[in-house]
A protein has these predicted regions:
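Helix-rich, typically C-terminal accessory recognition domains appended to large enzymatic cores
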Residues: 1, 12-24, 85-267, 279, ...
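Short Ser/Thr-interspersed hydrophobic loop/turn segments at strand-loop and sheet-helix junctions
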Residues: 3-7
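Short, conserved secondary-structure transition motifs
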Residues: 29-39, 213
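Short regulatory "switch" loops immediately downstream of catalytic or recognition motifs
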Residues: 35-42, 133-137
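Conserved phosphate-binding loops in nucleotide/dinucleotide-binding enzymes
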Residues: 37-92, 106-117, 246-249, 263, ...
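NTP/phosphate- and nucleic-acid-binding module
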Residues: 145, 255-318
Length: 318
């Protein structure tokens, strides 16, 4: 509101151009933060936290379970949360990450103190992964370089795909919660890597820290000081990671497998296969995939069809 007023004032005063009256391209209306609310099943009065037995969850005065719901925070409903207490206990970055991850920005956010432990664990896990990489790092080689027929590792492909999705979430869809979820999935993949000291892991950690910076700036600054190529640079001066289209060609394209009309799991091929293989070659690739072979077993296949557009594999044995 004040930014729009200031922009219009400066425009009318001739400081800004005549077309500069609106400082924002789009208004993102945020959802309400709802607090856990307890209501007495006897008096229907809103209960204070100390009026409820923390062990059993029943109202101390009546011994009966209260009616619990999520409502707009207010003093009269005794369902408010002091953000400063959360910051003191978990840190500002953890609080910010929790708010962005808990729900889409335009949906109501149901506040639960216990749920903040999830983002807190994520940051601790990332910090531990950085420390483990530094301890195990050897001379190594450069991260996967896409030259000729060299195939990037699955971790490298996931890293570039994550960079693409997070960039889209911040610039187009504003799906901040899914962006944080993608970062968590990338960290899980990093922690599952067989060689934690490899150059691939280092490149993925560096990308993850830079993608995390808008969500957790203080943590990312400290993490970049430990893992960045030039430790003197701030994470916000390191540049935004861009997804390499040559790497993205190797990401998995899922296909659903239907056996005699019933879903039986799925398989996948790379985007490169989708682009380069004709229908016959693509069918051969999917037919020989381990997931397909497992589904078919010893059955006698009468028909095997691949629908490239719908990404469905139809197998008829009866």
């Amino acid at each position: 509101l004040y930014a729009r007023f200031t922009a219009k004032f400066l425009r009318d005063d001739g400081v800004l151009p005549a077309k500069a009256g609106e400082p924002f391209k789009r208004l993102l209306a945020q959802g309400l933060v709802l607090g856990r609310t307890a209501k007495s099943s006897v008096s229907c009065a809103y209960l204070k936290p100390h009026e409820i037995d923390s062990a059993t969850g029943v109202e101390i005065a009546t011994g009966k379970a209260p009616a619990v719901s999520f409502e707009k925070m207010s003093k009269s409903k005794h369902n408010g949360t002091d953000p400063q207490q959360v910051v003191d206990e978990h840190g500002a970055d953890t609080l910010r990450l929790f708010i962005l991850f808990k729900a889409p920005y335009d949906d109501a956010l149901m506040w639960e103190d216990k749920a903040i432990s999830g983002p807190a664990r994520f940051l601790r896990k990332l910090w531990a992964a950085i420390g483990e990489h530094i301890d195990k790092r050897g001379d190594g080689s450069d991260p996967d370089v896409i030259n000729g027929d060299v195939t990037p590792s699955s971790l490298t492909v996931l890293t570039h795909a994550t960079a693409e999705r997070v960039t889209s979430a911040l610039s187009t869809s504003f799906a901040f919660n899914t962006a944080v979820s993608d970062l968590m999935k990338l960290l899980n993949a990093i922690c599952d890597a067989p060689d934690r000291g490899s150059a691939d892991v280092r490149a993925s950690l560096q990308t993850l820290v830079r993608l995390l910076a808008p969500f957790a700036p203080h943590f990312s600054a400290e993490a970049w000081a430990a893992i960045g190529d030039d430790r003197r640079d701030d994470v916000f001066e390191a540049g935004w990671p861009a997804a390499d289209e040559r790497v993205l060609r190797y990401r998995a394209v899922p296909f659903v497998i239907q056996l005699d009309g019933r879903g039986k799991g799925g398989t996948s091929v790379t985007q490169k296969d989708m682009d380069e293989l004709d229908d016959e070659a693509l069918e051969k690739r999917i037919r020989e995939a381990g997931e397909t072979v497992k589904v078919v077993g010893k059955r006698n296949v009468k028909a095997f069809r691949v629908n490239r557009e719908k990404r469905v594999v139809s197998i008829i044995t009866k």
